[in-house]
Protein backbone atom coordinates (compact mmCIF):
# COMPACT_ATOMS: atom_id res chain seq x y z
CA UNK A 1 0.00 0.00 0.00
CA UNK A 2 1.32 3.44 -0.93
CA UNK A 3 2.26 5.65 2.03
CA UNK A 4 2.98 9.35 2.04
CA UNK A 5 6.61 10.06 2.92
CA UNK A 6 7.45 11.55 6.35
CA UNK A 7 10.26 13.64 7.77
CA UNK A 8 10.87 14.14 11.50
CA UNK A 9 11.98 17.72 12.19
CA UNK A 10 14.20 18.10 15.27
CA UNK A 11 14.27 21.85 15.85
CA UNK A 12 12.70 24.64 17.89
CA UNK A 13 9.28 26.15 17.24
CA UNK A 14 9.42 29.95 17.04
CA UNK A 15 6.22 31.97 16.87
CA UNK A 16 7.51 34.98 14.92
CA UNK A 17 10.55 35.57 12.72
CA UNK A 18 10.19 32.75 10.18
CA UNK A 19 12.83 30.29 11.29
CA UNK A 20 13.24 26.64 12.33
CA UNK A 21 10.08 24.48 12.28
CA UNK A 22 7.76 27.34 11.26
CA UNK A 23 9.74 27.61 8.01
CA UNK A 24 10.57 23.94 7.50
CA UNK A 25 7.07 22.53 8.01
CA UNK A 26 5.22 24.54 5.32
CA UNK A 27 8.02 24.13 2.77
CA UNK A 28 8.20 20.36 3.26
CA UNK A 29 4.40 20.09 3.22
CA UNK A 30 4.28 22.02 -0.07
CA UNK A 31 6.57 19.32 -1.49
CA UNK A 32 3.93 16.72 -0.54
CA UNK A 33 5.80 15.23 2.42
CA UNK A 34 4.39 14.97 5.95
CA UNK A 35 6.46 17.06 8.37
CA UNK A 36 6.49 15.85 12.00
CA UNK A 37 8.06 18.23 14.55
CA UNK A 38 10.09 17.02 17.53
CA UNK A 39 10.47 20.33 19.43
CA UNK A 40 13.69 21.23 21.22
CA UNK A 41 12.29 24.53 22.55
CA UNK A 42 9.40 26.92 22.05
CA UNK A 43 10.19 30.60 21.51
CA UNK A 44 7.99 33.66 21.11
CA UNK A 45 10.44 35.19 18.62
CA UNK A 46 13.99 34.17 17.67
CA UNK A 47 17.02 35.60 19.44
CA UNK A 48 17.54 38.27 16.79
CA UNK A 49 14.85 40.34 18.53
CA UNK A 50 15.48 42.59 21.58
CA UNK A 51 13.31 40.41 23.83
CA UNK A 52 12.28 36.76 23.58
CA UNK A 53 10.49 34.15 25.69
CA UNK A 54 11.97 30.64 25.60
CA UNK A 55 10.57 27.38 26.97
CA UNK A 56 13.36 24.78 26.91
CA UNK A 57 11.87 21.44 25.89
CA UNK A 58 14.86 19.21 26.77
CA UNK A 59 13.18 17.46 29.72
CA UNK A 60 10.11 16.67 27.61
CA UNK A 61 11.92 15.30 24.56
CA UNK A 62 12.38 11.73 25.85
CA UNK A 63 8.70 11.11 26.79
CA UNK A 64 7.70 12.72 23.47
CA UNK A 65 10.05 10.36 21.59
CA UNK A 66 8.87 7.38 23.66
CA UNK A 67 5.27 8.09 22.61
CA UNK A 68 6.31 8.06 18.95
CA UNK A 69 8.10 4.76 19.56
CA UNK A 70 5.14 3.14 21.37
CA UNK A 71 2.86 4.23 18.53
CA UNK A 72 5.14 2.52 16.02
CA UNK A 73 5.94 5.61 13.96
CA UNK A 74 8.56 5.44 11.22
CA UNK A 75 10.19 8.16 9.13
CA UNK A 76 11.73 8.38 5.67
CA UNK A 77 13.90 11.27 6.81
CA UNK A 78 15.19 12.83 10.02
CA UNK A 79 16.32 16.48 9.89
CA UNK A 80 18.16 18.13 12.76
CA UNK A 81 18.60 21.90 13.19
CA UNK A 82 19.74 24.08 16.08
CA UNK A 83 20.37 22.06 19.25
CA UNK A 84 20.73 24.09 22.42
CA UNK A 85 22.86 21.88 24.69
CA UNK A 86 25.09 18.82 24.83
CA UNK A 87 22.18 16.98 26.46
CA UNK A 88 19.94 17.73 23.48
CA UNK A 89 22.57 16.45 21.05
CA UNK A 90 22.83 13.23 23.11
CA UNK A 91 19.02 12.85 23.04
CA UNK A 92 19.02 13.33 19.26
CA UNK A 93 21.78 10.75 18.80
CA UNK A 94 19.66 8.27 20.77
CA UNK A 95 16.55 9.23 18.76
CA UNK A 96 18.37 8.54 15.49
CA UNK A 97 19.61 5.15 16.71
CA UNK A 98 16.03 4.21 17.63
CA UNK A 99 14.30 5.52 14.50
CA UNK A 100 16.82 5.20 11.67
CA UNK A 101 15.58 2.35 9.48
CA UNK A 102 17.37 0.83 6.50
CA UNK A 103 15.87 3.46 4.17
CA UNK A 104 15.79 6.45 6.56
CA UNK A 105 17.96 9.39 5.51
CA UNK A 106 19.46 11.49 8.31
CA UNK A 107 20.16 15.10 7.36
CA UNK A 108 22.13 17.23 9.84
CA UNK A 109 22.27 21.02 9.66
CA UNK A 110 24.95 21.69 12.31
CA UNK A 111 23.84 25.15 13.42
CA UNK A 112 26.90 26.17 15.45
CA UNK A 113 28.06 29.61 14.31
CA UNK A 114 28.96 31.91 11.42
CA UNK A 115 31.64 34.33 10.22
CA UNK A 116 34.35 32.40 12.05
CA UNK A 117 32.70 32.49 15.47
CA UNK A 118 30.63 29.98 17.42
CA UNK A 119 27.28 31.11 18.81
CA UNK A 120 27.61 32.18 22.48
CA UNK A 121 25.73 29.10 23.74
CA UNK A 122 28.10 26.66 22.01
CA UNK A 123 30.56 24.84 24.29
CA UNK A 124 33.47 22.53 23.48
CA UNK A 125 31.39 19.58 24.71
CA UNK A 126 28.67 20.51 22.21
CA UNK A 127 31.23 20.69 19.39
CA UNK A 128 32.53 17.23 20.32
CA UNK A 129 29.03 15.76 20.40
CA UNK A 130 28.12 17.41 17.08
CA UNK A 131 31.09 15.60 15.53
CA UNK A 132 29.53 12.35 16.78
CA UNK A 133 26.30 13.32 15.02
CA UNK A 134 28.27 13.31 11.75
CA UNK A 135 28.80 9.58 12.21
CA UNK A 136 25.07 8.84 11.83
CA UNK A 137 24.33 11.44 9.11
CA UNK A 138 23.72 10.77 5.41
CA UNK A 139 23.90 14.48 4.56
CA UNK A 140 25.49 17.38 6.42
CA UNK A 141 25.04 21.06 5.44
CA UNK A 142 27.55 23.22 7.37
CA UNK A 143 28.59 26.75 6.50
CA UNK A 144 32.34 27.43 6.40
CA UNK A 145 32.54 28.25 10.12
CA UNK A 146 30.76 25.02 11.05
CA UNK A 147 32.82 22.92 8.62
CA UNK A 148 36.03 24.27 10.20
CA UNK A 149 34.71 23.54 13.70
CA UNK A 150 33.63 20.01 12.80
CA UNK A 151 37.09 19.32 11.34
CA UNK A 152 38.86 21.20 14.17
CA UNK A 153 40.80 23.40 11.75
CA UNK A 154 41.31 27.21 11.79
CA UNK A 155 38.82 29.47 10.04
CA UNK A 156 40.52 31.38 7.20
CA UNK A 157 41.18 35.02 8.12
CA UNK A 158 39.25 36.50 5.20
CA UNK A 159 36.61 33.76 5.09
CA UNK A 160 37.72 32.80 1.56
CA UNK A 161 38.95 29.34 0.56
CA UNK A 162 39.82 27.81 -2.81
CA UNK A 163 37.76 25.08 -4.41
CA UNK A 164 40.68 22.71 -3.82
CA UNK A 165 40.56 23.36 -0.08
CA UNK A 166 36.76 23.02 -0.09
CA UNK A 167 37.15 19.64 -1.77
CA UNK A 168 39.60 18.52 0.91
CA UNK A 169 37.23 19.71 3.64
CA UNK A 170 34.21 18.01 2.07
CA UNK A 171 36.14 14.75 1.68
CA UNK A 172 37.30 14.96 5.30
CA UNK A 173 33.71 15.53 6.51
CA UNK A 174 32.47 12.63 4.36
CA UNK A 175 35.15 10.38 5.85
CA UNK A 176 33.45 10.89 9.23
CA UNK A 177 30.11 9.49 8.06
CA UNK A 178 27.91 11.37 5.58
CA UNK A 179 28.05 10.38 1.91
CA UNK A 180 26.76 13.82 0.95
CA UNK A 181 28.15 17.18 2.09
CA UNK A 182 27.07 20.71 1.16
CA UNK A 183 29.28 23.54 2.42
CA UNK A 184 26.85 26.45 2.23
CA UNK A 185 26.80 30.24 2.01
CA UNK A 186 30.30 30.81 0.62
CA UNK A 187 30.95 34.37 -0.55
CA UNK A 188 32.35 34.74 -4.08
CA UNK A 189 32.14 38.29 -5.44
CA UNK A 190 28.52 39.04 -6.30
CA UNK A 191 27.50 35.42 -5.73
CA UNK A 192 26.81 33.02 -2.89
CA UNK A 193 28.32 29.61 -3.59
CA UNK A 194 27.43 26.15 -2.30
CA UNK A 195 30.09 23.45 -2.62
CA UNK A 196 28.65 19.94 -3.05
CA UNK A 197 30.24 16.55 -2.43
CA UNK A 198 28.19 13.49 -3.38
CA UNK A 199 29.92 10.13 -2.91
CA UNK A 200 33.09 11.37 -4.63
CA UNK A 201 31.44 13.71 -7.15
CA UNK A 202 31.97 17.47 -6.73
CA UNK A 203 29.76 20.31 -7.96
CA UNK A 204 29.19 24.02 -7.31
CA UNK A 205 25.83 25.81 -7.24
CA UNK A 206 25.89 29.61 -7.30
CA UNK A 207 23.16 32.17 -6.66
CA UNK A 208 23.34 35.98 -6.86
CA UNK A 209 23.85 37.89 -3.61
CA UNK A 210 20.57 39.64 -2.77
CA UNK A 211 20.46 41.87 0.29
CA UNK A 212 22.10 40.88 3.56
CA UNK A 213 21.68 38.00 5.99
CA UNK A 214 18.09 37.04 6.77
CA UNK A 215 16.76 34.82 9.56
CA UNK A 216 15.54 31.37 8.58
CA UNK A 217 17.37 31.21 5.23
CA UNK A 218 19.43 28.22 6.39
CA UNK A 219 16.32 26.44 7.66
CA UNK A 220 14.58 27.02 4.33
CA UNK A 221 17.62 25.73 2.45
CA UNK A 222 17.89 22.58 4.59
CA UNK A 223 14.14 21.87 4.34
CA UNK A 224 13.97 22.14 0.54
CA UNK A 225 17.11 20.05 0.05
CA UNK A 226 15.86 17.39 2.48
CA UNK A 227 12.40 17.15 0.90
CA UNK A 228 13.89 17.02 -2.60
CA UNK A 229 16.17 14.14 -1.63
CA UNK A 230 13.32 12.23 0.04
CA UNK A 231 11.34 12.74 -3.18
CA UNK A 232 14.12 11.01 -5.11
CA UNK A 233 15.89 14.00 -6.65
CA UNK A 234 19.67 14.24 -6.89
CA UNK A 235 21.73 16.45 -4.58
CA UNK A 236 22.72 19.02 -7.21
CA UNK A 237 19.11 19.39 -8.38
CA UNK A 238 17.97 19.72 -4.75
CA UNK A 239 20.50 22.46 -3.95
CA UNK A 240 19.70 24.34 -7.15
CA UNK A 241 15.98 24.25 -6.30
CA UNK A 242 16.64 25.55 -2.78
CA UNK A 243 18.99 28.31 -3.96
CA UNK A 244 16.58 29.49 -6.66
CA UNK A 245 13.57 29.53 -4.32
CA UNK A 246 15.45 31.43 -1.61
CA UNK A 247 16.72 33.97 -4.19
CA UNK A 248 13.13 34.77 -5.18
CA UNK A 249 12.16 35.20 -1.53
CA UNK A 250 15.15 37.45 -0.86
CA UNK A 251 14.23 39.66 -3.80
CA UNK A 252 10.64 39.93 -2.58
CA UNK A 253 11.88 40.78 0.93
CA UNK A 254 13.75 43.75 -0.57
CA UNK A 255 10.61 44.86 -2.40
CA UNK A 256 8.71 44.73 0.91
CA UNK A 257 11.57 46.46 2.77
CA UNK A 258 11.26 43.64 5.30
CA UNK A 259 13.53 43.78 8.39
CA UNK A 260 16.16 41.03 8.38
CA UNK A 261 14.76 39.44 11.54
CA UNK A 262 11.32 39.00 9.93
CA UNK A 263 12.78 36.25 7.76
CA UNK A 264 11.92 35.13 4.22
CA UNK A 265 8.44 35.98 2.86
CA UNK A 266 8.22 32.48 1.38
CA UNK A 267 4.42 32.37 1.54
CA UNK A 268 4.25 34.39 -1.70
CA UNK A 269 5.81 31.52 -3.68
CA UNK A 270 4.80 28.49 -1.62
CA UNK A 271 2.35 27.11 -4.20
CA UNK A 272 5.12 27.09 -6.81
CA UNK A 273 7.33 24.77 -4.76
CA UNK A 274 7.10 21.08 -5.60
What are the residue ranges of the model-derived segments?
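Conserved N-terminal subdomain of the carbohydrate kinase-like
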Residues: 2-108, 112-120, 271
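Short pre-catalytic strand/loop immediately N-terminal to key active-site residues, enriched for Gly-Thr
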Residues: 15, 202-216
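A non-catalytic, amphipathic alpha-helix used as a structural packing/dimerization or gating element
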Residues: 60-63, 132, 168, 237-245
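Conserved phosphate/ATP/ADP-binding segment of small-molecule kinases
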Residues: 120-202
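Short, small-residue alpha-helix embedded
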Residues: 149, 212-235, 239
Amino acid sequence: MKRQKRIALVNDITGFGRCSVTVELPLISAMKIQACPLPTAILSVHTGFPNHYLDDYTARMEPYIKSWEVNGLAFDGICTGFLGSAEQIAIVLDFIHRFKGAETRVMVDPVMGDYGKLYPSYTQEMCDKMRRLLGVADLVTPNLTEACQLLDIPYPEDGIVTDGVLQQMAEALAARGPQQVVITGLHEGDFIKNFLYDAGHMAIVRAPKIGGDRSGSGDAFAAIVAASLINGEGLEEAVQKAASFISRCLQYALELDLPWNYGLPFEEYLTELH
